[in-house]
Amino acid sequence: MKKIISLTILSLMLACAGEKTTSMAQTELAAGEYRLELQLTSEQTLPFELSLQKDADQWRAIIHNAAENIEVDEVLLTADSLFIRMPVFDSEFRLAIESEQQLSGAFYNYSRGLDYQIPAKMFAAAQARFTTAQPNFEIDGNWEAVFSDELEDEYPAVGVFKQEADYVSGTFLTETGDYRFLEGAVNGDKLQLACFDGAHAFLFEGAMEGDTLRGTFWSGNHWQEPFWMVKNPEASLRSPEELTYLKEGYDKLSFSFPDLAGKPVSLSDQGFQDKVVLIQIMGSWCPNCLDETQLYKQWYERYHEQGLEIVALAFERSRGDLGLAQRNVQRLVDKLELAYPFLIANADNDKAAAAAKLPMLNAILSYPTSIYIDRKGEIRRIHTGFNGPGTGDIYLRYREDYEGFIEKLLAE
């Protein structure tokens, strides 16, 4: 059957099984700390910690990524299975209960395809993500990095890390966004880092060779690439304000896309006239876009009455299915209780197709990309990518800078 049964429908089906299902489930699995492992390859495992909790008759889970705690309220426990549907993203775990100590099954990420899955195991154990030993090098600080060196897909990055004994946290910044909350350990000459947030399933492994750390980056079970990095306090990337721009012959942005109810919305609509308008090019499947959306929610609540409008243009991974695109974006809007409008720009996230929808731009290089328009309708800044809370002080400086910029535009 091509159509995946949603967790909501599944919940209704299981509810019909009656009280026996609930009581059996309670004896099979207990609340507490668990360790999940995603089998990315025959040798590489991505581990992370999960807390399973029960409030009255409602189960919930908390996924831990360094300083990030992801609360999951769509958790269904049956006589022999555990289902965990991730918030916002179109993904879930389906796990069979093998004993009180172990479950097995898979993680499904439907935004990557109806059949995309990663084998998964869940253990009743609270332990560190990685085996640790005495570290033989210090990773604390900034690192100049290159991924897919000398290959067609080569791109630069900056690693920013903090180290306490053998424990490491931090992230990589790229010109399209950061790799969010990474957590791991230095074990002798080796480094291991991981992140799981319901969309990203990232694993980094490497070892020091002289002054260079060389390793491999895995994203789920569909992608891997080599990387190297050297410590460099001055490591930097190109300015995010220089990458996306208006093509020659254009002086304005224009568009008309349907909102979640199907009503066409255009930048030329009366409601956007004499307003500062922030255009957010994004997707509901994108963790960096989620980080940005959480910040934009704060900005909208703070500045809307002063004349700020925010409009999100969603490019969805829904395989051309407009209805699915609308449902996925509506899920994001509902979960975050967002008040600014979201438009379906395309039911596909292909960047070339996205650029065709906005032909005045040189390219769509990243989800997200943000366009700042003043009260006269002139583009004042275009910011490519987003470095979120996982980047620490870099994110705080960005937020301070752009809040000042918005206030300047509102005052003009």
Regions found by a protein language model. Name each.
Residues K2-L7:
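Sec-dependent signal peptide recognition
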Residues L14-A15:
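C-terminal motif of bacterial Sec signal peptides marking the signal peptidase cleavage site
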Residues E28-A96, R129-F130, F137-M208:
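Central antiparallel beta-sheet cores of small beta-barrel/beta-sandwich binding domains
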Residues N232-D269:
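N-terminal "domain-start" segment that seeds a small globular fold
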Residues S266-E292, Y296, I310:
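Short active-site neighborhood of thiol/selenol oxidoreductases, capturing the structured segment around
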Residues D291-E337, D348-A355:
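Structural microenvironment flanking redox-active thiols in thiol-disulfide oxidoreductases
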Residues E337-P341, K357-I371:
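Structural micro-motif
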Residues S366-E412:
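Thiol-/selenol-based redox modules, centered on thioredoxin-like
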